[in-house]
């Protein structure tokens, strides 16, 4: 058995996905819109629904698609979104910001963390593009983040297990390393065994019925090539794999 119970965070972007993550046994939810773009700030209505969730829900604070380099207008929107999260009574936020060279933007992050005072904070995968992960981890610790969500800089966390293990060792008890990207029920236990992470993150999605991409709605761009949403069964399978460690 693992010395620590490994926590599962599930990222969702719909009301149905939120319900599926909770019913499947997730320990925490990262609440987003547009998971096809790796997650943007969720709509107010979805945050309001999440306020009654029986588990912690951390909304993503990401005002637009593209990079993580934010100007004053972006920062203003993000600070207002953090205030909205607090207003809905949600316990934390997922944030990140980069400089043009990929390094963490300490100036912007300080302002975001300050705005989020009293809330939990996760540093998102802006961490995965930094030039020096060891240095970036120390910055995250200094800023007071609870955890870092990272794939170890790889497309899949399973492809960077040595790096993730090194980050876990460096972090010690100061901050949690949460492995994400390419995490599925069939590989989550192996990922934990090889890295020592105490938290894992995934979308655990499956295909869902909906409008045919070849329909008029699809031709107009309203329907993606494949409709996916959080699968309660996949979440439950991942939870079962973790509990067996």
Swiss-Prot record:
Organism superkingdom: Bacteria
Coiled coil: none
Tagged with keyword Coiled coil: no
Keywords: Cytoplasm
Compartments in which it is found: Cytoplasm
GO cellular component assignments: cytoplasm
Gene Ontology terms for molecular function: copper ion binding
UniProt cross-references to Pfam families, sorted A to Z: CutC
InterPro entries assigned to the protein according to its UniProt record, in alphabetical order: CutC-like, CutC-like_dom_sf
Family affiliation: Belongs to the CutC family.
Designated name of the protein: PF03932 family protein CutC
Organism for this UniProt entry: Caulobacter vibrioides (strain NA1000 / CB15N) (Caulobacter crescentus)
Gene this chain is encoded by: cutC
């Amino acid at each position: 058995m693992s010395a620590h119970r490994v926590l599962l965070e599930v990222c969702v972007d719909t009301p149905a996905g939120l319900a599926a993550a909770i019913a499947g046994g997730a320990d925490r939810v990262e609440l987003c819109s547009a998971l096809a773009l790796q997650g943007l700030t969720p709509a107010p209505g979805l945050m309001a629904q999440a306020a009654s969730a029986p588990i912690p829900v951390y909304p993503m604070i990401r005002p637009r698609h593209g990079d993580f380099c934010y100007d004053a207008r972006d920062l203003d929107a993000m600070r207002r979104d953090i205030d909205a999260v607090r207003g809905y009574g949600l316990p934390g936020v997922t944030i990140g910001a980069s400089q043009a060279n990929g390094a963490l933007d300490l100036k912007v992050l300080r302002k975001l963390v300050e705005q989020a005072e009293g809330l939990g904070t996760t540093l998102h995968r802006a961490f995965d593009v930094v030039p020096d992960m060891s240095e970036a981890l120390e910055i995250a610790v200094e800023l007071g983040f609870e955890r870092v969500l990272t794939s170890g800089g790889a497309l899949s966390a399973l492809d960077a297990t040595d790096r993730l293990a090194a980050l876990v060792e460096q972090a010690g008890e100061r901050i949690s390393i949460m492995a994400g990207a390419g995490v599925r029920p069939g590989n989550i236990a192996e990922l934990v065994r090889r890295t020592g992470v105490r938290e894992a993150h995934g979308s655990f999605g499956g295909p869902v019925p909906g409008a045919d991409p070849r329909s008029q709605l699809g031709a107009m761009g309203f329907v993606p090539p494949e409709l996916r949403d959080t699968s309660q069964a996949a979440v439950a399978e991942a939870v079962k794999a973790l509990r067996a460690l």
